Amino acid sequence: MSEALTIEGRKQRARFRAWHRGTREADYMIGGFFDRYHATWSEAELAWFEALLEEDDVDVMAWALKTQPTPTRFQGALIERMQELDYVDIPR
C-alpha cells in the first residue's frame, strides 16, 4: 500500500513540475503529455518522465518536435507518443 502512495506522490510532484516549466508552450506540451498518459504509466515509465523533467525545456520540445535527435536514454515508446503532439490542448 505504501508503495502505491509513493508512486501517487511521485505522480503528483511530476504533474506540478510538468505544468510549471517556465513558458506556456512548455507547460502545454509537457503538462498536456502528463495529463493524457500518466494514469497508465508503470514505475519505469514514471521514472522516464521524471528524468525528462530534469532536462531543459528547449531540448525536450526539440525532441518532441523532431527538430533535434532524441538522446538514446529517452528513445522509445514514450518519446514517440510525445512526438505525436495529439495531447496538446490549447485554451482559446
Task: Give the ranges of each region predicted by the language model.
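Positively charged, polar, low-complexity stretches
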Residues: S2-R92
